């Protein structure tokens, strides 16, 4: 049996971005202490490259960068990878890409290759592809009903892709 705990933050409050560097460091240290009691810790961060995001990305373990095929998403993902890979405080060298809302597997692969090529050409690194999550109406349905995707639609294509990514990360 698998179990997990969730520590929820305030969405869109701006509080994290307003913390001083010392406060961010204390929060990161607290999360690192809690992490010792778990097999995996997932920190869901906002898009962007503000100090809070890059500091938490430096927590040891794989860093998943979620990207869609929209140009702004690819640009944000590239900027994050650049800052994270060049930050001397960062231990996040295991950067992996998750392509979300891909219309087809080929479109997802193309999105990954666009980002990967830019990283290779300009940063000298190639992030691994963690997985491709297809666009799936079951996701919107689960959100509308405020129910976890795999509870509401256990056979959803997006859910299967997410489960595969999670399984790969666990091993």
Task: Kindly give the residue locations of the regions a language model identified.
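G-domain G4 guanine-recognition motif of GTPases
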Residues: 68-69, 95-110, 132-139
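A cross-taxonomic marker for long C-terminal extensions/tails that follow the last structured domain
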Residues: 153-171
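Short helix-capping segments at alpha-helix termini
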Residues: 88-90, 119-126
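Conserved C-terminal guanine-recognition region of P-loop GTPase G domains, centered on the G4
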Residues: 74-92
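P-loop/Walker-type NTP enzyme "switch/lid" segment
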Residues: 1-36, 89, 141-148
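Conserved ATPase-coupling elements of RecA-like P-loop NTPase cores
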Residues: 17-19, 45-56
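Beta-strand-loop-alpha "switch" segments that mediate conformational coupling across diverse proteins
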Residues: 122-150, 162
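Inter-motif core of Ras-like GTPase G domains
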Residues: 28-40, 50-72
């Amino acid at each position: 049996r698998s179990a997990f705990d969730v520590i929820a933050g305030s969405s869109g409050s701006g509080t994290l971005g307003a913390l001083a560097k010392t406060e961010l460091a204390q929060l990161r240290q607290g999360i690192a202490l809690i992490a010792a009691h778990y097999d995996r810790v997932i920190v869901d961060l906002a898009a962007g490259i503000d100090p809070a995001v890059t500091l938490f990305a430096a927590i040891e373990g794989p860093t998943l960068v979620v990207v869609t095929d929209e140009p702004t998403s690819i640009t944000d993902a590239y900027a994050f990878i650049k800052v994270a890979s060049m930050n001397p405080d960062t231990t996040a060298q295991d950067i992996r890409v998750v392509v979300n809302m891909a219309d087809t597997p080929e479109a997802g692969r193309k999105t990954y290759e666009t980002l990967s090529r830019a990283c290779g050409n300009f940063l000298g690194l190639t992030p691994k592809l963690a997985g491709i999550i297809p666009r799936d109406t079951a996701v919107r349905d689960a959100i509308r009903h405020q129910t976890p995707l795999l509870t509401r639609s256990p056979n959803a294509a997006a859910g299967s892709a997410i489960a595969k990514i999670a399984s790969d990360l666990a091993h």
